[in-house]
Amino acid sequence: MYGKAFAPEYQGALTTLSVNSSLDDVLAVGTERLRAAEQAGEHVEAARSGLAVAEAHRRLGQVREADRAWKASYRAARDAGDVAAMAWALWSGGTLARQRGAFRLARRLLGLAAELGEQGGDIVVRGYSLAGLAETGRIQGDYEAVGRLHEQLLAEARRRGEARHTVWALEGIAQMHRNSGAHDTAYALFEEAARIAEGAEDRRGHAWALRGLADIVSARDGDTERALGLLTEAEESCRAMNLSGALAYNHKMRGNVLYRAGRYPEARQLYTQALGEFRAMGEPRGEALSRLGLTKSLARLGRDRAETAAELAELARELERIGLRHAREMVARAQNELGVEPATPATATQTPTSTPAEAGAEAPAPAPAQAQASTPASASASASASAEAQAQTPAPEPTTTVSGERAAVAR
C-alpha cells in the first residue's frame, strides 16, 4: 500500500537525496548546487537547491543560516515566476518560525504557503503546509481545533500511499490521545506508524514512533527496561542521520522513563543533558520540558521546597506567555505532585503575547486565504509583499532562556 518514503523538499538536482540522507550531506551537496545555479543564473534551480539548504540548516539548529536561506529561495522562486517554489520557501520559513516559538508568524506563513501551493498546483506543498498548521495547533494544545485536520490529512496521505506523511499524521494523532490519557489508542497508532515507517525505510519517522511507544510502555505498563530498549533503538537512527532535535527529545524521554521508575539521580543526569542540547539548538519547548523534568528530579532528591516552587511558578508563567497549553498543564500537575502551591496561578484564558522571535521578525499579516484574489498573479504579489517585508528583518539574536528564539531542530 505504501511506497518507499521520499523527501519532496529535496528537489531539482537534489532528488537523488533520500529521506535518510544525513543533514551534513544534504547541506554540502545543496550548497554546492546552489552556488552553481546562482552563477549560471538558473533561478528555478537556485530556489530548489536553496530550499534543501534552508531545511538542512533548520534541522541542524542554525537559525540565521536557515533564515537567510529560505528567504533567498523565495526570492529566486519569485524571480523565476514559480508559485509552487515560492510556497515551498514559505513553508520552510513558517516551520522555522514555529520552531522558534513564533506561533502567530508561523500560522501566517504556513497559511500563505498552503494557498500558494494550491494556486501553483502543487498538492504536496499544500499538504505539508496544512500539516504545519495542524502541528502548530497541536504543539499549543489546541486539540479540538486541529484534531479534524490531522484526521483529514491522514486520510489524504493514506489515499495517495504517502508513507512519510501517513506516519507524521498517525504520530500526531497518537500524541494527542496520549496527552488526553487514551494510552491504548495512542499505543495502537504509534505501533502502526512504526510499522509503516520501517517498511518505507523512513528512519526519522520510525525513531519518533519508537519514542512514542517507549513513553506509553513506561507510563501505562511500568516496563522500564523495554522502554529504555526502544529508546536505544531509536537513538541509533538519530545518531546515524545527525538528527539533533530527535536525539535531544529521546534523551528527555529517557529521563521521563527513569523518573517514573524512581531512578532520580539518573533522571537528573538525562534531563540535564537534554536541557543542554535543547539550549544549544534553541528549542524553547524542549528546553522548558527538560527544565520541568529536572526540577521534579531535584525536588525528589531533596531540593528546598521554596526553590522548587519558585522554579515551577517561573515555568508556568513562561509557558503561559508563549502559549503551550499542554505544557502548562504538566507544570500544574507537577505542582500538585510535589505539594507546592503556585506562586502566581496561570490564567488559562490569557492570550499569549508576542515572543521575542515574533517581535523581532514578524512580517505584516497577509490576508486570509479566502480573502485573497483567486489568481496566481495576485497571490504571488501578496506573497511577495509578505515575504519581502519579512526578509528585511534579520533573525533575532539567540538567547539561553526558555523563550530564547534560536531555531529549533524539528523532524
Task: Give the ranges of each region predicted by the language model.
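Amphipathic alpha-helices of TPR/Sel1-like and other helical repeat/solenoid scaffolds
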Residues: M1-Y2, E9, T16, N20-A40, ...
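Tandem amphipathic alpha-helical repeat scaffolds
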Residues: A7-S22, E45-G61, A85-G101, V125-G141, ...
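Inward-facing hydrophobic residues that define packing positions of alpha-helical scaffold repeats
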Residues: Y10, G30, G50, W70, ...
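C-terminal non-catalytic interaction modules
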Residues: A13, G276, A280-A369, A373-T375, ...
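Single-residue signature of alpha-solenoid repeat helices
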Residues: V26, A66, A106, V146, ...
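Amphipathic alpha-helical segments of tetratricopeptide repeats
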Residues: L34-R35, K71-D82, G111-D122, E151-G161, ...
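Eukaryotic tandem repeat interaction scaffolds
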Residues: E171, R178-S290
